[in-house]
């Protein structure tokens, strides 16, 4: 009897073995898949890329708001060289609602478009000594998407989403989590960046063994919308300085009245970011200074992003810069959408600026100028830079907000009471480039002959600025250093236009990453999982054979059972819905919340199963009436993009 009982137990144990092996195999394979999830975002090729090695890059979506299907799109480029330390620069464009692919393909990315089919190398790209991470922020911008009834309204909400994004991005790419982290951008990103920085500082206070601190090393804001009080007033001051409006004329009087009303409204409610009365100043100025007839037969107005240029009224710069005519069709190509890991069947297509994001953005939070003193005092350096020919976020407004701001025991750029830091003349390769001014952790750089998008005009100069701000040490790199001087004094050497050699640390890192890429390829093809299953089946078969031989020797027969062990998954249905509605320009919507005209309105959504490496589970919502929005455009007459920003859809730019 004892023999029978023991044999029965032994047989039962072997029958349970397939389930145990399957569970172990699935668990092990799942852990491996999670660890290698970054392979799903790898960009294997980029249509139109120039001959030569492709810059290593990853792109795709990360879910930040499962309740409303909010996903942020990122495009990450690996650094070409590692200097004295690892660095990552996050780049954000503004709007709100303007895509950071502006920055990727027209400003600081490794490639620019020669035409809509051809990429060329960008001499001065920011990924020379830093990894660069472009993010379409907030949800609904560019390739990012969200339910159309769930656009965000607040800067704090935007910052919270961004922290979630970073946590999941670093989980996918843990090799970058200990990098020195810089956040850079322009225009309305002057509101985004300080709020994100504040959220990181608060997160770091509660960091522990699991969620350890991020090394926030600095902020860079170009032509930023930061302080309404000084920057609205600077519209007319800039117009006087540039001769757009002459003092004492009837036109000057007509513009001085709304400027005075604007300042009154700001005095009454000083903690707002946008004021309707103030937005009318720029609109009126562009309209009343328009004159002459261009080749199109339309009146000519000043380009608000570069007053050296003229444009058809009422566009006034919204079709600028000229590269934009190639960027839009390029990012809508099916092969590009596939390469960047976008679901091509369910995307409305990329648009530079989504007017719906701006129209739904109604921040009640204070302007970001109120955050800068605490950020500076926390030890995070800030660099503000301006293109001298930009009107919409002009340098006079930036210089005024610095002069009025108090931080680290002083006001403005004063070194001691009554003594201010000097403006140091900057020459770059023998040409006047601008000036630098610095005090108490804040640096200001003015770029001569430059627009709202300084990196578009001078990629090599802005890269030189970045490298100096980051403290790049090229001693281990080599290469031809640029001649960059302040007041004639040669600055520490940085290379511009590519380093000749590479550091040992970078070579070792590359070798390790190539090895990891092989394992990712195995995982992606399923070969590893297949091997595991075959081995597990062989082991189980051997144990069954051995057991049957043993029981046969004891006078018992193995009995086949009808049990089946299976592990199944229930696929979730995709969520669908229509993107409806159009944006109407009001006030400066037609100027700053641009990019309108005809928009794609077919039903769109995203298959979440393709993006679930780090996604949270979300409840089914089969009755949602208006689902994912990705790059909806506003419907201004010229089909152009928004700018600086505004809760009323009136501002910002890229």
Swiss-Prot record:
Residues 1-29 form the signal peptide. The chain crosses the membrane at residues 525-545. Protease with a carboxypeptidase B-like function involved in the C-terminal processing of the lysine and arginine residues from protein precursors. Promotes cell fusion and is involved in the programmed cell death. Keywords: Apoptosis, Carboxypeptidase, Glycoprotein, Golgi apparatus, Hydrolase, Membrane, Protease, Signal, Transmembrane, Transmembrane helix. It is found in: Golgi apparatus, trans-Golgi network membrane. Residues 30-524 are lumenal. It is an enzyme of class 3 (hydrolase). This is Pheromone-processing carboxypeptidase KEX1. Residues 546-654 are cytoplasmic. Its EC number is 3.4.16.6. One of its GO terms (molecular function) is serine-type carboxypeptidase activity. GO terms for biological process: apoptotic process; proteolysis. The keyword Transferase does not apply. Belongs to the peptidase S10 family. Residues 567-583, 645-654 have a biased composition (Polar residues). Its main location: Golgi. Residues 563-654 are annotated as: Disordered. The active site is at residues 187, 390, 452. It comes from Sordaria macrospora (strain ATCC MYA-333 / DSM 997 / K(L3346) / K-hell).
């Amino acid at each position: 009897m004892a023999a029978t009982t023991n044999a029965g137990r032994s047989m039962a144990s072997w029958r349970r073995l397939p389930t145990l092996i399957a569970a172990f195999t699935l668990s092990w394979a799942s852990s491996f898949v999670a660890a290698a999830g970054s392979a799903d975002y790898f960009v294997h090729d980029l249509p139109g890329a120039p001959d030569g090695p492709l810059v290593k890059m990853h792109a795709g979506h990360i879910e930040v708001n499962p309740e409303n299907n909010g996903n942020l799109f990122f495009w990450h480029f690996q650094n070409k060289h590692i200097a004295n330390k690892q660095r990552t620069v996050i780049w954000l464009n503004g709007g709100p609602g303007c895509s950071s692919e502006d920055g990727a393909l027209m400003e600081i990315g490794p490639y620019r478009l020669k035409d809509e089919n051809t990429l060329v190398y960008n001499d001065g790209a920011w990924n020379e000594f830093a990894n660069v991470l472009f993010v379409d922020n907030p949800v609904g911008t560019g390739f990012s998407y969200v339910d159309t009834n769930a656009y965000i309204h607040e800067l704090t909400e935007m910052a919270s989403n961004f922290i979630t994004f970073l946590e999941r991005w670093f989980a996918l790419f843990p090799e970058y989590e200990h990098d020195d982290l810089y956040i850079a951008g322009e225009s309305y990103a002057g509101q985004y960046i300080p709020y994100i920085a504040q959220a990181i500082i608060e997160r770091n206070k509660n960091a522990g063994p699991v969620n350890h601190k991020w090394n926030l090393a600095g902020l860079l804001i170009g032509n930023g919308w930061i302080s309404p009080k000084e920057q609205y007033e600077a519209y007319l001051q800039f117009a006087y300085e540039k001769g757009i409006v002459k003092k004492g004329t009837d036109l000057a009087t007509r513009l001085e009245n709304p400027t005075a009303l604007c300042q009154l409204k700001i005095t009454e409610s000083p903690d707002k970011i946008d004021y309707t009365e103030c937005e009318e100043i720029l609109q009126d100025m562009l309209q009343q200074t328009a004159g002459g007839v261009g080749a199109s037969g339309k009146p000519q107005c000043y380009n608000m992003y570069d007053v050296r240029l003229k444009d058809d009224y009422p566009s006034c710069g919204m079709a600028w810069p000229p590269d934009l005519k190639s960027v839009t069709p390029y990012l809508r190509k099916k092969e590009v959408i596939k390469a960047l890991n976008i679901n091509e069947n369910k995307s409305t297509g990329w648009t530079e600026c989504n007017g719906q994001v701006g129209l739904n953005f109604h921040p009640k939070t204070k302007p970001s100028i109120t955050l800068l003193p605490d950020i500076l005092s926390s030890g995070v350096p800030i660099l503000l830079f301006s293109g001298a020919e930009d009107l919409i976020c002009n340098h006079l407004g930036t210089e005024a907000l610095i002069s009025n701001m108090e931080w680290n025991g002083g006001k403005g750029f004063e070194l001691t009471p009554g003594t201010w830091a000097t403006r140091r003349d900057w020459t770059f390769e023998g040409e006047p480039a601008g000036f630098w001014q610095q005090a108490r952790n804040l640096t200001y750089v003015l770029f001569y002959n430059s627009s709202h998008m300084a990196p578009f005009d001078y990629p090599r100069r802005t890269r030189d600025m970045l490298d100096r701000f980051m403290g790049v040490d090229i001693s281990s790199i080599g290469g031809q250093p640029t001649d960059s001087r302040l007041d004639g004094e040669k600055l520490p050497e940085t290379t511009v236009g590519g380093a000749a050699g590479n550091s040992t640390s970078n070579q070792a890192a590359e070798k390790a990453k190539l090895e990891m890429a092989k394992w990712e390829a195995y995982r992606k093809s399923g070969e590893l999982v297949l091997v595991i299953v075959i081995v597990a089946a062989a082991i189980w078969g051997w144990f069954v054979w051995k057991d049957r031989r043993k029981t046969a020797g004891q006078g018992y027969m193995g009995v086949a059972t009808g049990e089946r062990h299976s592990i199944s998954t229930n696929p979730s249905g995709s969520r669908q819905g229509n993107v409806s509605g159009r944006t109407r320009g009001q006030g400066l919507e037609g100027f700053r919340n641009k990019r309108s005209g005809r928009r794609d309105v077919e039903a769109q959504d995203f298959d979440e199963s393709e993006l679930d490496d780090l996604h949270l589970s979300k409840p089914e919502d089969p009755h949602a009436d208006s689902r994912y929005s990705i790059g909806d455009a506003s419907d201004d007459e010229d089909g152009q993009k928004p700018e600086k920003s505004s809760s009323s859809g009136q501002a910002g730019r890229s």
